């Protein structure tokens, strides 16, 4: 008799019992319904791509987390998000699409990071993106979080906040403080502030050769606490320091004003100058969404503006903005804390 192999699932991979899978599918269906209501079209892209396609703009932490392998003469990578495949898709099918192109995609992605609470190696993302041809109105940067607000309310989630920043504001501040040359590394360090805290971020900045006094002054700005109005006033003190900052500040305040205009209550969004987003392709507005009183789950929904992502696949200018819900993570948050809309639960 052959040896019995233990039936087990790899760490970081989700496998549900039927009653839980039913709930998961209902949540996914509700997301699709809301996305379609706002005029987004469904899209599905391959899980496997040529590594040159997916890694054209990767770098940094992303390259450390990818699943990459060779099959014959092919160098293949499993998709680590749904945004890079979208950029390739739009560039490839440009002549067949109508712009602004609004798409949603719900599918599995793969990252070889350490499995822990709220973090998986195989997980579902539920994305919406708006891609323009040549230009894309800043109004779209505000529409995205307003859609998330309405979707989360439909799911029965009430205790969340969308934290908003702008990469140009950050880059302008780095220039003002004389650390522009280290901007990419500083962004990655700041992106860890919720995980490792201000003191450890300051320590890593100093290790990066940022003067201790400069690191402290920079973090004083990025961690400044107060209302959205207070933070706008704080940032006004840097107006005119450089063109990049001024452009980002204008975009940030415009987005905040439009979010209010879309009817999102002030309790559900806030300016957070420490939000950086770890992926390298964001160029302007950035978002992260957190469940209040549950920091252990991290961001359940994040994204932002990317003006240059498609440049690796086409010479056309195809700016975009989008947001991605970590559906697998959100599912566990909803079920473990009884946040789920009763209509979505199993009978």
Language-model features and meaning:
Residues 57-61, 176-178, 285:
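Short low-complexity, flexible loop/linker segments enriched in glycine and/or proline
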Residues 62-73, 178-206, 291-293:
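Acidic, His- and aromatic-enriched active-site or binding-groove loops in soluble protein domains
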Residues 43, 47-76:
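Polyanion/phosphate-binding surface patch
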């Amino acid at each position: 008799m052959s040896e019995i192999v233990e039936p087990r699932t790899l760490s970081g991979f989700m496998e549900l019992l039927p009653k839980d899978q039913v709930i998961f599918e209902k949540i996914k269906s509700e997301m699709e319904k809301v996305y379609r209501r706002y005029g987004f079209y469904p899209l599905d892209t391959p899980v496997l791509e040529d590594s040159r396609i997916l890694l054209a703009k990767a770098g940094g932490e992303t390259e450390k987390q990818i699943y990459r392998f060779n099959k014959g003469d092919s160098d293949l990578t499993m998709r680590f998000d749904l945004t890079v495949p979208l950029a390739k898709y739009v560039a490839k099918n440009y002549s067949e699409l109508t712009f602004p192109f609004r798409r949603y995609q719900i599918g599995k992605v793969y990252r070889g990071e350490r499995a822990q609470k709220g973090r998986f190696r195989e997980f579902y993302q539920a994305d919406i993106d708006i891609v323009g041809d040549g230009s894309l109105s800043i109004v779209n940067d505000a529409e995205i979080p307003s859609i998330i607000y309405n979707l989360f309310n439909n799911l029965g989630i009430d205790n969340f906040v969308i934290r908003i920043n702008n990469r140009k504001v950050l880059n302008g501040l780095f220039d003002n403080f004389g650390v522009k040359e280290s901007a990419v590394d500083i962004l990655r360090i700041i992106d860890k502030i919720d995980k490792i805290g201000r003191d450890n971020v300051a320590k890593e900045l100093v290790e990066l050769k940022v003067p201790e006094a400069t690191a402290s002054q920079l973090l004083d700005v990025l961690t400044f606490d107060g209302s959205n109005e207070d933070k706008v006033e704080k940032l006004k003190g840097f107006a005119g320091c450089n063109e990049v900052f001024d452009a980002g500040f204008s975009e940030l305040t415009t987005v905040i004003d439009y979010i209010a205009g879309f009817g999102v209550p002030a309790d559900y969004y806030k300016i957070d100058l420490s939000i950086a987003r770890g992926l390298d392709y964001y160029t302007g507005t950035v978002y992260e969404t957190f469940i209040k009183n549950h920091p252990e789950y991290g961001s359940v929904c994040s994204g932002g503006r990317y003006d240059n992502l498609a440049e690796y696949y086409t010479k056309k200018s195809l700016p975009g903005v989008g947001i991605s819900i970590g559906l697998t993570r959100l599912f566990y948050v909803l079920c473990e804390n009884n946040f789920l809309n009763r209509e979505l639960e199993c009978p």
